[in-house]
Each structure stands twice: as structure tokens, then as C-alpha cells.
Amino acid sequence: MLFSLRNSGFFAIGLLLGHAGHADPDTYIRAGAIVDVEAGVVLDGRTIAIEDGVIVAVTPSSEVSIPSGAGLIDLSDYTVLPGLMDAHTHLLSDSDDHGLNSLVVSLPEATINGVKNAAITLQAGFTTVRNVGAPGYADVALRDAIAAGEIAGPRMLVSGPGIGITGGHCSDNNLLPYEYGVTENGVADGPWAIRQMVRQNVKFGVDLIKTCSTGGVLSAGTRLDAVQYTLEELEALVDEAHMHGRKVAVHAHGTAGIRNAILAGADSIEHASFLTEEVIELAKERGTPLVMDIYVTEHILTEGEASGVLPESLEKEREVGQIQRESFSRAHDAGVAMVFGTDSAVYPHGDNARQFSRMVQFGMTPAEAVRSATVLAADLLGVGDQVGRIAEGLQADLVAVSGNPYEDVSILENVEFVMKGGVVYREP
């Protein structure tokens, strides 16, 4: 097995610099089975041909004669899936950096955390992530270093600093007293200040815009149901972002904030906790995907106090956790698009796949849960022509597990093989 970051207390320099993987100019993967995530079926005995990191053929193994000298990866005892995708991550934060603990994390330390957590996330089988909120555009640098092959990590789409109101969830500096005079990177009030902040984020290289239209669980002094940004302000933000070809992810727990975000044209709603039937129908009508992190409540309520989560945040999580899960079930049953996103860093990085079983518990089939982290996530992120399926012409981003994830989706918590762009980062 290649060096396993997930199960080790230190990191191999070779892997972090991107040299632990290997790729052949012509590679064949002999799979015991592959998952067709579009059709929702498992196909036995397939061989995947890869050239220069791209899938060039997917063929029944009985019909394939592998050329002499070609690279062969034998996964005949495994089921192969497209690389998994998480649409709501915070790679530059750690799960013990909550509450007052967050005040001692410098930007350089956050950047180093990002290098570590990117490698852990890739080892867990997540080959693409959308990072929604990071200080100082450090996520832009992390994305670029991964893309250049300088460090190991998933493909990243990044937002830079979240944009939010003074004193809101996206400007969570409420732990500091007034005399410090600290204002976080993304604070903007009023339509024109918001447009300027969108332009600044675009200038510094973001792939998308993240904003907050309600308070949050982990931000001090904010209410989950309180609207942050008026409809006018959100419309200005979305309009400016779309002018620059950037999608918008909106953090929203409360009903009014969710409604405003959908009406403003948001491309996804994050958390979406307090859903009414009216808002569910509005999301369905507008085709607005929901990214609902229904695993994190367990970690917050069992481990949160030890990791610095504030008492008021624990109380808010007790209020919202079960309600969010019930909203998830109702939105799913109504046919709203649901995309896999976990809010990693609230819980330890690498445990992303634990959410699959909760999605099934609260209404999805295993096939739907897998689809939410592949095809649907790729569509939301705008990369469906590159990743998200095992198909000719797409990047060779592949993971393998022992067993059938459509029979037991929890096996995705134990990925045994990871390939990204034709390079192997983990193998049995």
C-alpha cells in the first residue's frame, strides 16, 4: 500500500510534494465492477483504459486484450467508482479550531493546515472539492499548488473569503472586543460595497463567491433565523458574480434567508435547515440545489465542547440538527436537487464519507447518495465535462472499495484505491 496519510501521525515529504504517485503513458485498470452513477447500476467485469490521465475507453474485460508492456492495475477484487466530490469544505481550518481556539490560528498556520488537510481529503477518496470560505486567499494558493503538482490534494474550486455583513456569520470576529478594531476580509455592507468585494475576490483568483444570508451555528452572537443581507443586497452580489462568470454559494439556515437567496438567483443553498413547503417548492421550481451537511450535528454535540465550540453554538446545534435532517427528508421527497457537501473542518478531515449513510438514513437510496457526490456535484461545480463519471474523455479520477456501495453505502468510508488524473495516490 502507498503511504497512508489518513492513518499516520506524520506526512511523507514525497507525497506532499506530489512525487508519491505514479502514472504510465498507457494504463489499464481491470475492475471487478464499476459503478455507472448516471444509470444507477453496477456493471461487472470492466476494463478502463487511460492515456495521459484521461479515460479513453471503458470496455467489458472479456473483450479486452491488454498490450504487452502496458501498465496494468489489477482491481479485479474491487468496485471502482468515479472520484468522490465534496461541495462544502474548509480545508484551511481544523476541527479543533472552534470558538476562542480560532483566535490563535495565524494565516501561515492555516495555510499549512490546508496542505495537510488537502492530502488527507484526497486519501479519503475525494478527488474534487469546493472550498467555501478561507482567509487571505490562501485557498487560491493551495488550489494552484495542487494543480501544478507541487503538493498532493483534490482538485479545488475556491471562494476566498466569504462575503458578509458587519457582525455576521461570514465576518465572524465577534469574539474580539471592540477596541481591537478587527474587520475580516470579506465584510461589505450595501449593494455597491458588495459589488466591490465580489470584484476584489475575482481579482485575486476565486472560482466562486461564498456569502451568508443568515446567522450560523458556530458564529458568536448570530441567530440562525436572522436575515443577513437584504434581497436587494443579495441580488447585487449574485448579479455581479454572474457578470464575472462565478457561481454563488449562499450559507442560509433560516427560512427567510433561504427564500431571499433563491429569489436572488443563488446557485446553491448551503445548510438549508429551516425549510417550509413554500421554500421547497421554490427551490424545485428555480432548480436551486441544496447542499445540506447532515452529518456534522453528531460531531458537534459529542466532540464540540472539547474542540472549543462555544456553549451558545452547542445550544444552536441542539436546536437545528434534527430540524435540518427532517428538512433534508422533505426536500428529497419533493424532488429538489441535493448535492453532497459536509462542512469539513467542523469534523475531522478525511471523515467526509460518513455523511453517505446519514443521507440514506434520512431518505435517499444509496445510488442517490453516490450520485449526489459525483454527477450532481460535478454539475453544480461546473466541471461535469471533466469529472464525475467513468466515461471516455473524462479525467481518470477513480476510487475503489471492497463490496457494492449500492448495497452498503458505508463502505465508502474505507476507500482502498485513489487515482486522480491518472496518478495513483492510494492502492491496496
Summary of predicted features, one role per range:
Residues 93-110, 166-182, 217-231, 286-321:
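Active-site gating loops and adjacent loop-to-helix segments of metal-dependent hydrolytic enzymes
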Residues 144-162, 224-250, 287, 291-295:
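Alpha-helix-loop-beta-strand connector modules within alpha/beta enzyme cores
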Residues 113-139, 153-161, 206-219, 247, ...:
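Divalent metal-dependent hydrolysis catalytic cores, especially in the metallo-beta-lactamase
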Residues 24, 34, 39-81:
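Histidine-rich, glycine-flanked metal-binding segment
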Residues 95-99, 219-221, 258-264, 294-309, ...:
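Histidine/acidic-residue-rich catalytic or RNA/ligand-binding cores of hydrolases
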Residues 78-150, 165-170, 174-176, 232, ...:
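Metal-associated gating/positioning segment near the N- to mid-region
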Residues 24, 182-264:
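Metal-dependent enolase-superfamily TIM-barrel catalytic cores that perform enediolate-based chemistry
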Residues 104, 243, 247, 312, ...:
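His/Asp/Glu-enriched, well-ordered alpha-helical/loop segment
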